[in-house]
């Protein structure tokens, strides 16, 4: 599949649930193209879908103090922002109701008003190892689905108004 997005913010940086796109004043372009396949009667499943982002990243007025702290830079450097990544790519081994694999795709867990409850598509995906159900497992109490993943979330590398900088933190949620 081929996916393109164009976004233009004329006054201030804004963006939410845009994946690898950044909150940006000015023009921003996103493109992704890839291939999906299954081999050996579905035993091996793969998707290669790299992503490219270009943003003008124009200058902004100085921000005020924010209520929430986190890695939310007001501006991603002082130059034009360009980034390419492995995007929504993965490779999995499917056996019965279980899948095991490596992925850089976004993970979204649970419903939410503006984004998923635990994980979302509000940032680029991270590289991770996953063990997950690929279909519901029927039990006498109902059906069960789940996912275990482990990976390392990396700091953006850009300064932001409030909060410390860091080199990453490990992530090992089970849902």
How would you label these PLM feature ranges?
Residues 19-24, 75-79, 117-120:
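Outer-membrane beta-barrel domain signature
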Residues 59-63, 112-118, 156-165:
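Outer-membrane beta-barrel translocator domains and adjoining extracellular loop/strand segments
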Residues 108, 126-175:
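Signature for the C-terminal beta-barrel architecture of outer-membrane proteins
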Residues 5, 39-41, 50-56, 95-97, ...:
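Transmembrane beta-strands of outer-membrane beta-barrel pores
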Residues 1-25, 34-40:
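N-terminal periplasmic/intermembrane-space "pro-region" immediately following the signal or transit peptide
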Residues 37-44, 94-97, 136-146:
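Short loop/turn motifs that connect adjacent beta-strands in outer-membrane beta-barrel proteins
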Residues 34-78, 83:
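Carboxylate/His-rich catalytic cores and anion/metal-binding grooves
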Residues 33-37, 89-95, 102, 129-135:
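Residues on the lipid-exposed face of transmembrane beta-strands in outer-membrane beta-barrel proteins
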């Amino acid at each position: 599949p081929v996916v393109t997005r164009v976004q233009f913010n004329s006054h201030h940086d804004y963006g939410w649930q845009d994946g690898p796109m950044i909150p940006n004043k000015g023009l921003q372009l996103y493109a992704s193209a890839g291939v999906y396949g299954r081999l050996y009667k579905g035993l091996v499943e793969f998707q290669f879908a790299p992503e490219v982002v270009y943003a003008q990243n124009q200058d902004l007025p100085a921000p005020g103090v924010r209520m929430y702290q986190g890695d939310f830079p007001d501006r991603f450097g002082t130059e034009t922002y360009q980034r390419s990544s492995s995007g929504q790519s993965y490779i999995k081994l499917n056996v019965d109701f279980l899948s095991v694999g490596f992925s850089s795709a976004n993970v979204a867990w649970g419903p939410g008003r503006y984004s998923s409850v635990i994980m979302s598509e509000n940032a680029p995906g991270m590289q991770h190892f996953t063990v997950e159900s690929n279909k519901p497992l029927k039990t006498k109490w109902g059906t069960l689905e789940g996912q275990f993943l482990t990976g390392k979330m990396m700091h953006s590398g850009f300064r932001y108004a409030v909060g410390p900088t860091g080199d990453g933190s490990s992530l090992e949620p089970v849902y």
